[in-house]
């Protein structure tokens, strides 16, 4: 068995794991997430701990993948995930218009981004965006989509970047 799949997934208080044929659902204070269960992976729940095993030797790697996704689902419905973005550049700013995010990124028009279901967007300051949600994959996807509107450029570092991201700078051409 893979090293990842050997580790059990602990279920905190208030989190329910429900295994049905072909479907796994995790319910907690931050919402409900579902995962299609692969045929060769078995999930056993014993006293607040879920363990995974493979029926077939060819499914061992998949068992580790399912365990990692399941652990992220449990963390998501109990604590949630967040990704912070920073806007760097003169005149670059973000503002909330209801539930939509309005971005001024140097284009002739403001960009309006509609948050998908299950994702919460907020702007603590004009140059910061916080993406929050229970599904780790969707939070990262939305953050990457917002970053993709104006990725950081290597000469001045202007653009939308993740908080803490280091932009490798290039030197300007010498005359």
UniProtKB/Swiss-Prot annotation:
Q: Is Mitochondrion one of the keywords? A: no
Q: Which GO terms describe its biological process?
A: cytoplasmic translation
Q: Which UniProt keywords apply?
A: Ribonucleoprotein, Ribosomal protein, RNA-binding, rRNA-binding
Record GO cellular component, one term: cytosolic large ribosomal subunit
Matching entries from PROSITE patterns are given as: RIBOSOMAL_L6_1
GO terms for MF: rRNA binding; structural constituent of ribosome
Q: Name one Pfam family in it.
A: Ribosomal_L6
Report the domain of life of the source organism. Bacteria
Under the heading HAMAP family, the entry gives:
Ribosomal_uL6_B
Record function comment: This protein binds to the 23S rRNA, and is important in its secondary structure. It is located near the subunit interface in the base of the L7/L12 stalk, and near the tRNA binding site of the peptidyltransferase center.
Q: NCBIfam families of this UniProt entry?
A: L6_bact
Subunit details = Part of the 50S ribosomal subunit.
Family classification:
Belongs to the universal ribosomal protein uL6 family.
Please report the name of this protein according to its UniProt entry. Answer: Large ribosomal subunit protein uL6
Q: What organism does this protein naturally occur in?
A: Xanthomonas axonopodis pv. citri (strain 306)
